C-alpha cells in the first residue's frame, strides 16, 4: 500500500538518489544484493512503499534513474548499492545536456523522455495504491532541471491526482558550478510552480555550513552533503514505512502545508545533527530536538526563517516518545516565537510521530516548513537572472535549441510574482484579511 515511485535525474539527482537508497536499504535491512537481512518484522511490514519484491525474495527499489550522459549512472552502478536496481530502470542518453536547460527540456531530453516514461509507467503499474512520485534533481544544470521538469509535466498529465514531490537543489549564493545557473533555475521554477505539489528546497551552501559548523567536518564531500539530504527524505516518508502513533503521508503533508497553491516551496531541516563521533554520548529529549529543528542553522536552504514568517510547518518525530510531550513542545514553539508565525493561521504546526528511529539514533525529527523567507532564495536567483538577461548573455545557447526569448521573460515574471506573493502574505495580518474580503465583495 501507499507506494512511492522514486525518480532521479541528472548528475546531482543521481548522486543524492544513490545515497538515499543506501540510507533506506539500511533502515529496512536490505543488503546490496537485494536480500533481506534485517532483525525486525517492522522492517518488512511496509517495505513495499519503496521496494518491489522480486522472485527469490529479492527486494528491488521502485526507482527510475535517468541522465543524458552515461557517466554518473556508471558510477551509481559501480557504487555500493549498484546491483540493487533493476537494470532496465537505467535510462540514459549519450550526448549530455551540457548545462543547457533547453537541451534537457526541448531537444536531447525530449528524445529520451518516452523511454523514461515507459519505465515510470511500468513501476506505477506494479503498485497497489500509488501515493505519488518523488524526484531528486538539481535546478542549476541541464538534465536535472530541463529534463526533470519535462518529466514532471508529463507525469502530471498522466497521473493528475497523484502527489508530485521534488527534492530540488537550488543554485547556492556563494558556490556556483555553472555560469548559466540563474537561467536554468528560473526556467525550472517556472515549471515547478505549475506542475509540482511539494518542492523541498535544498541548497549546497547551507549543507556545507551544516557540515562545517555543526558536524565539524573540515573537508565535507558531496557524499556528506547527500547524506544530510537523504536523512530528510527518509524522515519525510518514515510514517508511510513504519508504524506510528500519528501518521502523515505526502498528501497530508500537502494539505497541511500549502495554504495557497503556488506557495509550495518548503525548507527542510533535520535533528539531531551531531558530529559523527560524539553522537552516542547524548540522550536527546523532545524539547532539545524541537529547539534544534527550528534553529535557522539546521535549515538545508540558505534562507533564514527569522527574516520571514512561517505560514505552516510540519514536524515529524521518530523514536519512542510521548505524543503529549510532542504536542506540548509544538504549542510551546508557537507561543514563544509567535512573531515568526502568521497569526491568521492558528495552530499552524502539524506533528506526526513514528515509532521507529533511524539507524544509530534513539530519536530524531524532520522539519518541513513553509516560510515566506524562502523568497530570499528566489530574489537572489532573479537578480542574477536579470543581470545576464538584460545583456542577453549566453542566450544563443538556448535560442539555438529552439527556445524563444518570450519564455525567458515569462519565467522571470512568474518568479517575481512568486516573490511578491510570499511578501504579501508575510505582511498580511488577521485584521486585514477580513477587510480584503469585504473590498472584494464590494468590487463584485
Curated annotation (Swiss-Prot):
Subunit composition and interactions: Dimer of alpha and beta chains. A typical microtubule is a hollow water-filled tube with an outer diameter of 25 nm and an inner diameter of 15 nM. Alpha-beta heterodimers associate head-to-tail to form protofilaments running lengthwise along the microtubule wall with the beta-tubulin subunit facing the microtubule plus end conferring a structural polarity. Microtubules usually have 13 protofilaments but different protofilament numbers can be found in some organisms and specialized cells.
Keyword DNA-binding: no
Cofactor: Mg(2+)
An example molecular function term from Gene Ontology annotations: GTPase activity
Entry's Gene Ontology BP terms: microtubule-based process
Keyword annotations of the record: Cytoplasm, Cytoskeleton, GTP-binding, Magnesium, Metal-binding, Microtubule, Nucleotide-binding
UniProt subcellular location: Cytoplasm, Cytoskeleton
SUPFAM superfamilies for this protein: Tubulin C-terminal domain-like (SSF55307), Tubulin nucleotide-binding domain-like (SSF52490)
Task performed by this protein: Tubulin is the major constituent of microtubules, a cylinder consisting of laterally associated linear protofilaments composed of alpha- and beta-tubulin heterodimers. Microtubules grow by the addition of GTP-tubulin dimers to the microtubule end, where a stabilizing cap forms. Below the cap, tubulin dimers are in GDP-bound state, owing to GTPase activity of alpha-tubulin.
Protein name (database record): Tubulin beta chain
UniProt binding sites for GTP: 11, 69, 138, 142-144, 204, 226
PANTHER family attached to this UniProt entry: TUBULIN
Superkingdom, natural source: Eukaryota
Similarity comment text for this entry: Belongs to the tubulin family.
One Gene Ontology CC term in the entry: microtubule
InterPro entries named among the record's database cross-references: Beta-tubulin_BS, Beta_tubulin, Tub_FtsZ_C, Tubulin, Tubulin/FtsZ-like_C, Tubulin/FtsZ_2-layer-sand-dom, Tubulin/FtsZ_GTPase_sf, Tubulin_C
Main localization (coarse): cytoplasm
Binding, Mg(2+): 69
Amino acid at each position: 500500500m501507499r507506494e512511492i515511485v522514486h525518480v532521479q535525474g541528472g548528475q546531482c539527482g543521481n548522486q543524492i538518489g544513490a545515497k538515499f537508497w543506501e540510507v533506506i536499504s539500511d533502515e529496512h535491512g536490505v543488503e546490496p544484493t537485494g536480500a533481506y537481512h534485517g532483525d525486525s518484522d517492522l522492517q518488512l511490514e511496509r517495505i513495499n512503499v519503496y521496494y518491489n519484491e522480486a522472485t527469490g525474495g529479492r527486494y528491488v527499489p521502485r526507482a527510475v534513474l535517468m541522465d543524458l550522459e552515461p557517466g554518473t549512472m556508471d558510477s551509481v552502478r559501480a557504487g555500493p548499492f549498484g546491483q540493487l536496481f533493476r537494470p532496465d530502470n537505467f535510462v540514459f542518453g549519450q550526448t549530455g545536456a551540457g548545462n543547457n536547460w533547453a537541451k534537457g527540456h526541448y531537444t536531447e531530453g525530449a528524445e529520451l523522455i518516452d523511454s523514461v516514461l515507459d519505465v515510470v509507467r511500468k513501476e506505477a503499474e506494479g503498485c497497489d495504491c500509488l501515493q505519488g512520485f518523488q524526484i531528486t534533481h538539481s535546478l542549476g544544470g541541464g538534465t536535472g532541471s530541463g529534463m526533470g521538469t519535462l518529466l514532471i509535466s508529463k507525469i502530471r498529465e498522466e497521473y493528475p491526482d497523484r502527489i508530485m514531490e521534488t527534492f530540488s537543489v537550488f543554485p547556492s549564493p556563494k558556490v556556483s558550478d555553472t555560469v548559466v545557473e540563474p537561467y536554468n533555475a528560473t526556467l525550472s521554477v517556472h515549471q515547478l510552480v505549475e506542475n509540482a505539489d511539494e518542492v523541498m528546497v535544498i541548497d549546497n551552501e547551507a549543507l556545507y555550513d551544516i557540515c562545517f559548523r555543526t558536524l565539524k567536518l573540515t573537508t565535507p564531500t558531496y557524499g556528506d552533503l547527500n547524506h544530510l539530504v537523504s536523512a530528510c527524505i527518509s524522515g519525510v516518508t518514515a510514517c508511510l514505512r513504519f508504524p506510528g502513533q500519528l501518521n502523515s503521508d505526502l498528501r497530508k503533508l500537502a494539505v497541511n502545508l500549502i495554504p495557497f497553491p503556488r506557495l509550495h516551496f518548503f525548507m527542510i531541516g533535520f535533528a539531531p545533527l551531531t558530529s559523527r563521533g560524539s553522537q552516542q554520548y547524548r540522550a536527546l529529549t523532545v524539547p532539545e530536538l524541537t529547539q534544534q529543528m527550528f534553529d535557522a542553522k539546521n535549515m538545508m536552504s540558505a534562507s533564514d526563517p527569522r527574516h520571514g514568517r512561517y505560514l505552516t510547518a510540519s514536524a515529524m518525530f521518530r523514536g519512542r516518545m510521548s505524543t503529549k510531550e510532542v504536542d506540548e513542545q509544538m504549542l510551546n514553539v508557537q507561543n514563544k516565537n509567535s512573531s515568526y508565525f502568521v497569526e491568521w493561521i492558528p495552530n499552524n504546526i502539524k506533528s506526526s510521530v513514528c515509532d521507529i528511529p533511524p539507524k544509530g539514533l534513539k530519536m530524531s525529527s524532520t522539519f518541513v516548513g513553509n516560510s515566506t523567507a524562502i523568497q530570499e532564495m528566489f530574489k537572489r536567483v532573479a537578480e542574477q537572472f536579470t543581470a545576464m538577461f538584460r545583456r542577453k548573455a549566453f542566450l544563443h545557447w538556448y535560442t539555438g535549441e529552439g527556445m524563444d526569448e518570450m519564455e525567458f521573460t515569462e519565467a522571470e515574471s512568474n518568479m517575481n510574482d512568486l516573490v511578491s506573493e510570499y511578501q504579501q502574505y508575510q505582511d498580511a495580518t488577521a485584521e486585514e484579511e477580513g477587510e480584503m474580503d469585504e473590498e472584494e465583495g464590494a468590487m463584485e
